[in-house]
Amino acid sequence: LTLSKQTVPHFYLTVNCDLTRLSEIRERLNAHAPRDERKLPVWKLSINDFIIKAMASALRQVPDANVTWADEAIHKYHSCDVGVAVAVEGGLFTPVVRAAESKSLSQISMEMKDLAARARARKLLPSEYQGGTTTISNLGMFGIEQFTAIINPPQATILAVGAGLERFVPVKGQSVLRTQMTCALSCDHRAVDGALGAQLLAAFKTFIEEPALMLA
């Protein structure tokens, strides 16, 4: 990553995302999750599961951003393979949710739970953490409000996600308390220019703020 910071022409885009509707849908979906023989929910959706799905959906909507940069060329992909940074002792792994755009939220949730557990136990296969067309780094659980992340070559983007915080925002002329999270997209300018990066981040924001669109 040190080499990436020194050689990749990073630029950064930032947006605030309102979590009101996402939180409501998440609560309803979790309340109706199927139960196993012990009466425990088979899955429990996290905010991060929605973020993975939203990023994959955004890449599907803005396919020119679903790229990597290697050998002085842009490589385009049909599948949206989303890596997710998982902290482990002494470093991190980035297990990849393959074809996340085509998976349901519950599928992503169960798969990510398994991948994260095996990452922390250092039992991932190389094929489970190599590759990927983008990465998500979420430090919100540590109370970090905002940060920028270093691109993991040959990927051309990485999304840094901050904590969901209550803020007063203007809504129809009124100051309303809403939960928002700040997200920063780092882009490799050789493969994803400013306009393209802005389209991708705008699409991501739309899916986060209108999560029903991810269920269509």
PLM region spans:
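C-terminal catalytic/motor cores of large multi-domain enzyme assemblies
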Residues: L1-A216
